[in-house]
Each structure stands twice: as structure tokens, then as C-alpha cells.
Amino acid sequence: MERTLAHVPSMELSTEALLVTGGLDNTNKMITSSAVRNDDGTMISQHSEKVSYGTSGAPDGSTPPVTAAGGGSEGNGIGGGGGGGGGMVGDGTGHSVGSSASGNDDDKPAKQKRHRTRFTPAQLNELERNFAKTHYPDIFMREEIAMRVGLTESRVQVWFQNRRAKWKKRKKTTNVFRTPGALLPSHGLAQFPSPMNDSFCNFHGQDTRGWPAMSGMTTHMAPHMTTHMPSHQMSQMGGGPGSALALPPSIPRQGLGQSMQQQTVNCTMGQSTGLNTLSMGTNGSMGSMTSMYQPSLGGMTTGSMSSGLSSPSPPNLPVSDSSTDLSCSVSDAGDMWRGTSIASLRRKALEHAASLNGNL
């Protein structure tokens, strides 16, 4: 680096000299300071009016000749040993300019954000149609599709990848829901007895479209009720909430009440008849009770059907009162069964005691 000053006063020279030689060693500082304190101008080169100070020199301490910035003469300046890198450079007017080596800061281009591709309905229809043909199109097919829909081949490839992933996910979900027993409870539902299944299936299959079908249903239902249903099932059927559902909705309230009254009268008459026949055998009493209940049920169904045909009414009338009457009558019948069995046991006990006394 070079330092050149021209027509500089002693005060400015001393200040500038101190600034320049601040980075040198102590020996150069002393020499330069002595030269600055000497104000008679002896340190100024005789061949030029400018003074040149070398801040870098050869290893042996000598400085190469320096060309003055203001003239064509050369002069030897006072210089020291090895110099450093950056320094102050004069511009010929007494002002110093700092020089520094700065790295090249290359501005990196901002990363472009890829916008989401928006497909038109026509493009989606074409892509879906090709996806229905094949899920894995080759490069030629993708290029052909891209030309048809106005997209790039890479966009078409990405769309097929996303579409395959969506299809696999949907297929997996569908297979989970289609697995037998995946969402069903582990325990099975209780099965109805076979006679009840037959009767209720016949009832729902006919769907109350004609009263002859209903009469056939009741005729089919009566023997099952008399032969296959015990007393507690009959009471549950009569008193439970399902009894109102078991009746057809078009049965009128008046006809149903008349049939219930007729059935109650039959039950009371059967009770008196059953009490009068206690002296008979057990088999005979059971047979009489069966024969007694069969006509009563037959009378109930026949009376209700005839009353329903004579006076039709809307199907939405409540039948809670009639179901209550039916439950009371059937529960009375169950009590009569229970009383008959106890009486027969007592009668057998008395007969056994009498036979024992006779043997004695």
C-alpha cells in the first residue's frame, strides 16, 4: 500500500503520520515522529514537493521508489520493514480513503412457492375416466392425457399418485365395514318358539288386507295357544305391552269390548264347571279344562271378527282398556289352573289317607 501527501502543513502532517504509522512497529514510529517534529522541511524530498511514505517494503528494510501522484519525479520515502494488508490511501488532496477487502455476498434467489393445481371439471372427468381404465398409466399414456387436458405430464403423474392413495384408503375402510361380525354384538338374539314364529309371520305376511286372512290366522293361532303355551306365557302375553301390538289395528273398540266380556263370562262359567268336576280324576279334570278353554278362545276370536265386520272404525283407536281386560281374564284363568292343581293334590292326599285307614 502507498501513502502520498502534497503541500500539507506540519500539524496536519504530524496527525496524518500518526494515523498511518499506527499499525507499524515501534522503530518506524520513532523515526516518523522525529521527522514530523522537524518543521523546517528537511524531510521533504528535494525532487518533489510531495512526501511519500511507504507502508510496506522489502524484508531488508529498504523501500522501492514510489511515483508521486502530483508530478513525474521519483523520491525515496522513509519506510520500515514488512508491511501489513489494508491501510489508508491518499487521493492527492490530503484526504485519506480507507480500503478494505469485502467478500462477495451473493443474494440467493427466494424459493418459489408452488401453487396448488386447480383442476377444472372437464379435466377431472377425463382423469377419472382414465383412472377407471388403469390405475398405473405408463409414460406414453400420461403424456397423451396431459395433451388432452392441457396439463403437464408431471401434474398428471402426481394426480394419479394421489388418486391411488385415496382409492386404497377408501378400499381399506370399506373392507373394515364389510367384515362379517365386525360391528355386530357377539351374543345372538333370543329366538321365538316355532309356533309363535309361524303365527306372527302369517300375521305380518297377510298384512290385514282381508278379514278372511285374519280369520285364518286366528284359526291357526288358537290350537297353538291351547296346546303349546303354558299358563304363565298366556298371562305375560295378555298383560304385557306387546298384547296391543299383536292385535290388528282395524279391530273396533266396541267389538273388542264385547269379545272381552264374552270371554270373561266363559272363564267364570268354566271356573264353576271346573269346581264341580273336582271329584273326577286328574286326567279327566285336565281334559275338561282343555275343552273349556278351547271353546272360550274360539268364541273370543269369532265374536271379535263378527263385531269388527259389522261396525268398522279407524285403525288408530287405542286398545289399552281391552288389553287390560284380556290380561285380567287370562290371569284369572291361571289362578283357576293353580287352584285346581292344589285341590287335586289335596284330594289325592285324602284318598291316600283313607286307603291307609282302610288297610288298617
Curated annotation (Swiss-Prot):
Localization in the cell: Nucleus
Cellular component GO terms held in the UniProt record: nucleus
Gene Ontology molecular functions: DNA binding; DNA-binding transcription factor activity, RNA polymerase II-specific
Chief place of localization: nucleus
Annotated spans, Disordered: 48-117, 295-326
GO biological process assignments: neuron differentiation
Compositionally biased residues, Gly residues: 69-95
CDD domains (alphabetical): homeodomain
DNA-binding region: 112-171
Keywords of the record: Developmental protein, DNA-binding, Homeobox, Nucleus, Transcription, Transcription regulation
Keyword Nucleus (UniProt): yes
Protein name, entry field: Homeobox protein orthopedia
Organism: Lytechinus variegatus
Gene field: Otp
